[in-house]
Amino acid sequence: MQNSTTEFLKPRQIDVNTFSATRAKVSMQPFERGFGHTLGNALRRILLSSMNGFAPTEVAIAGVLHEYSTVGGVQEDVVDILLNIKGIVFKLHGRSQVQLVLKKSGSGVVSAGDIELPHDVEILNPGHVICHLADNGQIEMEIKVEQGRGYQSVSGRQVVRDENRQIGAIQLDASFSPISRVSFEVEPARVEQRTDLDKLVLDIETDGSIDPEEAVRSAARILIDQMSIFADLQGTPVEEVEEKSPPIDPVLLHPVDDLELTVRSANCLKAEDIYYIGDLIQRTETELLKTPNLGRKSLNEIKEVLASKGLTLGSKLEAWPPVGLEKP
């Protein structure tokens, strides 16, 4: 049984200092020396890379075929409009994707709040500007919003080809992470006479689609889930797979006599222990020309006969000769 000198301390004091709906500091203590940096770095990396969120992944603007177009009566070009759409913070409830519609005309600002929303979709920054319209300007678009994790480029994301997809729909690189910024500090902590302990302080800022405190809980659950496999570490037995020899073309198992060569050529081959077609095709022209009494004329005869069967000299065969093959 472990005594007090070998048992690990666990954090007993957790404080949450909330600055706003999107920013909070979470402090935990005490940790054994070094564990503040170990866990702080792990949680920070998970928070930045592995949290689920929502982002626009596809936009179709009426009259626009590609991102380098312009829209009449709209101050911004399409590239700027798409960048502004990426800045909208969405939150979906009970669904993983949604198709949204935006229609507006007349002079003024087009903002995220102008997007038509179903009851289970929120926009957390409705004042976010998408574009500006002139007196005769109008804009109509569809925006596809999906749930995902981390950052996904268009090339790295599996895009399902939909025959009903609107022509001119523009795919977007998507940053799903709801974490805007996260940092951590490790401060000294003290328990009774021990002064070599750590206090971990996490400073988290989100886009508002997730509470900072909930983000820390989610990151901790991910870390525990990933590390739990090591708590019950067992080697996986490796099944021995019997190596099977590659199949051999039956033609190669035929004796060279089946090639109907001249008696002179056939005898020269047998003198070199070449009994099967499989033996023959592994020899090179140079090797055969070194065979006593086999000249260029006989070599050309052999090449022509092999070519008629789709075979050539100098071929490589694995597992030759096959088990059980005897001299005829």
Swiss-Prot record:
One of its GO terms (biological process) is DNA-templated transcription. It comes from the Bacteria. Residues 248-328 are annotated as: Alpha C-terminal domain (alpha-CTD). It catalyses: RNA(n) + a ribonucleoside 5'-triphosphate = RNA(n+1) + diphosphate. GO terms for molecular function: DNA binding; DNA-directed RNA polymerase activity; protein dimerization activity. The keyword Nucleotidyltransferase applies. NCBIfam families: PRK05182.1-2, PRK05182.2-5, rpoA. DNA-dependent RNA polymerase catalyzes the transcription of DNA into RNA using the four ribonucleoside triphosphates as substrates. This is DNA-directed RNA polymerase subunit alpha. It comes from Neisseria gonorrhoeae (strain ATCC 700825 / FA 1090). The lineage of its organism: Bacteria, Pseudomonadati, Pseudomonadota, Betaproteobacteria, Neisseriales. The gene is rpoA.
